[in-house]
Amino acid sequence: MIRHQNYGTDLDPQLSQYDIFKEYTGGYVKSISANKTIMDILSNIDWESNNLNVILSKVFGVNPGDSIEEIVEKVHSQVKQNYNNPASKSIYGREALYYKIIESPTQWLYKELTGIIEKSLFFHTFKGLSWNIFVGKSPRIRSLFLQNKLSQWLEDTNPVSEGSHKRRIAYDLDLPTNDDRIYHSSYRGTVCPIETPESGKIGIVLNYASGYRNTNKDTGYNIVALPPSLIPFLNKNDANRCLMGSNMLKQSLPLKKSKWSKVITENYINMYNYHWTNIKSPVAGVVTSVGTNRIRVKTGSGEEIPVEIYTNFSGNKKTNYTTVPKVKVGDRVEAGDILTESKFFKSGVYTPSTPLLAAYLPYNGYNFEDSIVISQRLVDEDILTSEWAETETLTFDKETLLPTQGFCDDYNISQDWVINSEVIKSKIGQTLHSGEPLFHYFRPVKLVDDFIVKTDNGYPQNLFSLVDIRAHYDDSRVDAIYLLQDNEILEITDENLNKCTSIVICTSGCHKVEEGDKLSGVHGNKGTVSKILPVDMMPRLPDGTPVDIVLNTMGIPSRMNVGQLFELSLGLCSETLRKRLEEYGDTDKGREYLRNLLVLLKEEIKPNHDLLDELIEDIDNGLVTKMVNTDVVFLMPQFQEITTSVVKLILRYLGLPEDSAAHLYLPEFDETTKRKVIYGYNTILKLEHMVKKKTKARCNGLNNPDPTFEEHRGQRSGEMEFWALESHHATATINEMLKYTSGNYQN
């Protein structure tokens, strides 16, 4: 039974959807059968297959020959089926939201189409109606499926943001109150209490909770959504910091060298099913060829099925989706087996970043107020180097003029700007610097009709303005250039260059970490890189190992995200245990060493007896798990109560300090810290807020960066920043900000 907050009446879920809508609105809604006359007219319209959205056929099963009635009915039934899924609990006010977003535009579409058909019948015969009356001056169908609130640009920065966006829900409230934002008790197990935006939409935009496998108790629902389920020791953190950690996970970039986290949850393994770049085999058979663009699988009947894979594919957020084949020629695969794996995954486990050796201590003011000090090793060895890919399309319209040989000869334009097939082929594979032009084209300047310019050879012409397509970042590599004509790829020739309708340029590259980039942990601990020190100047452990990153201790007590300290200590245990097992190898001594640790844990961790017994039995039978052969990872249940006594037990068994702390040596000051410093391994994410994306174009007056981040521009220093510096009498800084010395650019 469903209870509405305004009417207070019980509604039977088996009622007709129109009856429920009528109950909510108090109005009368006509059924589809009432418009049978209009639908008869629509059924006889000549539909063109290439005008239908391809997504409709894939998602809703819409065919090119379907009528308007069939299209709307299929979409209606599909959405209705998803909302009535028994696995999804009843959400407070969900039905009213559903009809406001889905049913209202549908009824509006019927009304609009009725007017269009009746008006068109005055000017056309019955057979003269075509699809153009819908996509011409009145694009009604397009506005329903492309401009509706449910039609959104997918956030695919990483698998977490993609999975979270697909599970997002929002209340359509014009003026939400505080009562609307409060987490209702009926949401538990259906809507996540943690993940929500930090903006004015807080509590209004929500996310469905995700299912998970609980080793302690079999339950049908999980309380948190997908991003919070990736935070180990979630119950050790303040909820506000968990919210920030969830949002940071959705902003992490794919790294060139990502590794397993030292401490993971169950959903790090389940994430494999959330990303579309993990391509599965459509049929069972034998792999016959593995290439850079496709994999071929030969079935039992002798047919070869090609499976396309992606190389330097650009997502909506310009992240690089490069898939790595996981099979080789001759392998036997079944339907559903993984063929390729994206860079977000290693052996089926989600790897958002790489664990770094971290130490918590104030360091000479460089990590004041959430600033971060990192080692030069992270730059030189590409540990925090992110990859990007970008696609630019130059579409030719009536005003776009490409400087071909004939065009340059007619209008006396420099031969340096000539573009032909040889020039295009020579640009493929080039590495460009930031601001270096890749293509030139011209647009005519609109002038008064009687104003004509005479060129040297006597031809009259209008004035042309030169437009450049330039590289946005350093070390931009041109991967491919395509000539397209009506979405068909043409061969790069001079003849095809004159008749193509667009040119597609694919570039890719890497971003090394630098001062000003934003880093974050999974527990909501975030900051910007303020100093990159040489490896010789980084603090050192007692055994001489330099740390990778130095964080400030003042960022923990007031934020109350203590889960990062548990992850820090267990990460140190994981790395130490890996080194011990690597030293012992697959010997009786190594198996005995691991078995004794599991026996100790069995006495301390009560609910996991069965799991630990299986591991001990495997070791007794001479089996070593696949994880131990490559790395040692602690798999933590989401809300498992791990006490400090358990962590101390593991540290003590491995011969490490119980407090996971030691006196560090500071080479910069040639002294040892007076107090112990806690150290270990934390997962550090590199976020999409990079400093090289923030400072781009500048205005003419104050030489400040222009706004509009989407146009490859950056942030500008406004009046309030100027006042703040003025109040501190920072004249030198103001001089740098407001004059030409604020950036390294010409003229």
Please report, for each region that a protein language model flagged, where it lies by residue.
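Intrinsically disordered, low-complexity, charge-biased terminal/linker regions in eukaryotic proteins
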Residues: 1-81, 89, 93
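Long insertion/accessory domains within large nucleic-acid-processing enzymes
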Residues: 1-4, 9, 77-284, 288-747
